[in-house]
Design a protein with these regions (language model features):
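Short coil/turn segments at secondary-structure junctions
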Residues: 6, 80, 120, 160-163
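N-terminal beta1-alpha1-beta2 submodule of the flavodoxin-like/Rossmannoid cofactor-binding fold
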Residues: 1-109, 170-238
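Short, glycine-/small-residue-rich phosphate/pyrophosphate-handling segment
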Residues: 109-152
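Active-site rim beta-loop-alpha module in soluble metabolic enzymes
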Residues: 154-159
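A short secondary-structure junction signal
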Residues: 91, 129-134, 162-163
Length: 238
């Protein structure tokens, strides 16, 4: 199987250690591709809207964005790891996710995403882990992903992995290993189920695209939906 990992920071600290524990289950039989932000990611989105109005390849950071997207689309499992920075994901992670706005449901979602599975790993000192995960989960859901597992930890102690008590480390390792085992035994030849929330988003946007298409048949997003057959009876999860 193929796994693509997006690391919200280049630092090899607590979040990195947690991510490594999770990946241990997959090392022997998986092809793992990792990106460390910000060095492997795009710069800040400038809001030029070229990806929305015309083509994503017109983005100033298209080379890096398309490289990451290729890995995401080819992967069976997506892993996102981010510490909490002031109750949110890292700026580098947010910058990367912004560049995939054109893949949100109201625009041009990739049909491959509807069957994907994802794991989000976050950690914080006391609070902010869940809101950090939500920053990432919002994008994944609007990309069309339904199976999203959030694993979040409150350290309530040291922020240096080497200084965390062994008992706490063991607890963290046990939880991450348990989640990893569940995802390791999945038959990835079968796409994940698409839940009601994602389907609802799809049908609401479908009505919007149908309306926009009547006004302007050359509208970029409508043409994409129409070419995929989604305005008709074709569905990306079937």
């Amino acid at each position: 199987m193929k796994i693509t990992v997006i690391n919200g920071t280049e630092k090899h600290g607590v979040t990195y250690s947690m991510k490594e524990i999770f990946l241990e289950q997959f090392r022997d039989d998986s092809e793992i591709t990792e990106y460390y932000l910000p060095k492997d990611g795009p710069g800040f989105c400038t809001g030029c809207t070229a990806c929305f109005r015309n083509n994503q390849n017109l983005c100033k950071d298209a080379e890096k964005v398309q490289k990451i997207e290729k890995s995401l689309l080819e992967a069976d499992l997506l892993v996102f790891a981010s510490p909490a920075y002031v109750f949110h994901t890292t700026g580098a992670m947010k910058a990367m996710l912004d560049h995939f706005g054109y893949r949100w449901m109201p625009h041009r979602p990739a049909k491959e995403m509807f069957g994907k599975r994802a794991v989000i790993i976050t950690q914080c000192l006391g609070a902010g882990g869940r809101s950090t995960a939500k920053d990432i989960k919002d994008s994944l859901s609007w990309w069309g992903i339904s199976t999203i597992k959030v694993v979040s930890f409150k350290l309530m102690s040291e922020i240096d992995w080497n200084k965390i008590e062994d008992k706490r480390k063991a607890s963290i390792q046990k939880k991450l290993s348990s989640v990893a085992k569940k995802f390791h035994v999945i038959d990835y030849n079968k796409p994940g189920n698409t839940n009601v929330i994602v389907k609802a988003k799809f049908y609401i946007v479908r009505m919007l695209q149908t309306s926009l298409g009547k006004k302007n048949p050359e509208y970029t997003d409508f043409k994409y939906w129409n070419e995929n057959g989604w305005i008709g009876k074709v569905r990306p999860w079937k």
